[in-house]
């Protein structure tokens, strides 16, 4: 009996201690969670963790990285990196009448065209990029894909950090999360395709943010040998009169181009000349180059609108071309529209040496004037969005937040007043937020695949990029009514 009482007493004491410890732990936990900064930190970590998990869980799927991976493997084997001859073969069969456009949707012809186009120009980057990926090409595809996605994600976080520094929002986690949510469709699509865009954005931002000219040139040249579009940012160095940075960019570009010669000199030279001939001399000069439904660049949009052979699988099905013109006329239209877009940049931004606006415009140009701009390419809107969001955020801090703290009306009334106030005093911010929300809602899961197909064929994302470009120009001219005019100078 005594033993039983002792045992029961020990258990009771243990339970009391356990309950007491749990109570103290719960109180401490609640005190921490009541802290606003802790909530924000937990939410931010959870957001980026989910974003990373979403990407890494799909790393084993077929994606654009497979093209990089296969090209890297072919580099080690000495096999040709490029395979664009199908374009000439398809056009020859269409022009000779062997394949008739009106029979494009018959089962036999459709499957024939689909098989010919699936591997079409899968790798169009310079040989250096394939060479740089050789270390991870020795791993199985799934492992290599996960490594590349992780590097991409780290570059994405690095880009957000540089953005926070340039806009004096270091440690402002909510700003970064909102910026990501507004661009979530592009970020998610980029991860699903395991593309190289995040690395390019980081290299570009790091190059323009660094004060050392040799380091800026080194970083920008690396981005340039991966993809040509970062070459537009040489204009940023020119605007800032950083002529040494331009010189170092040129020198290091040559260094990166000839670096693979240490591994396979004759093969590197052969592939570099092949890339120049196939990509630069032939295909990128033609508006027909991969002008498919999902290609949202200016060049591809004009081809879809006015050239009958631009996207033979989708044009007739969706009511295109709108008007049949010759390729020469379409090229002329491209030149005219390019001038219309570029002149305001040089007149309003470049001449006035506004650093942030210039960067934002160049990121937009990297999408618009690229020969190929799939949905994932629009992650380049991250920086233009940051400029416009910073403006809207500052306006909200000055004019909206004090009202919310002082007013006791209902949530709906305060929200309606805030929208009216933004529209009345800062139309640039209002248009930016409205446009970003609209693009966010134009998702297949919301609007359906049929409507999304029609929007993609019309290149609605191209118009959204141009819309942001116009807002950047107006942001220079018009300041919010409640804020004094000032220059953004982060140098």
Residue ranges with predicted function:
Residues 150-155, 195-203, 223-229, 250, ...:
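Membrane-embedded alpha-helical segments of multi-pass membrane proteins
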Residues 158, 162, 202-213, 236-241, ...:
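Transmembrane alpha-helices and membrane-interface helical segments
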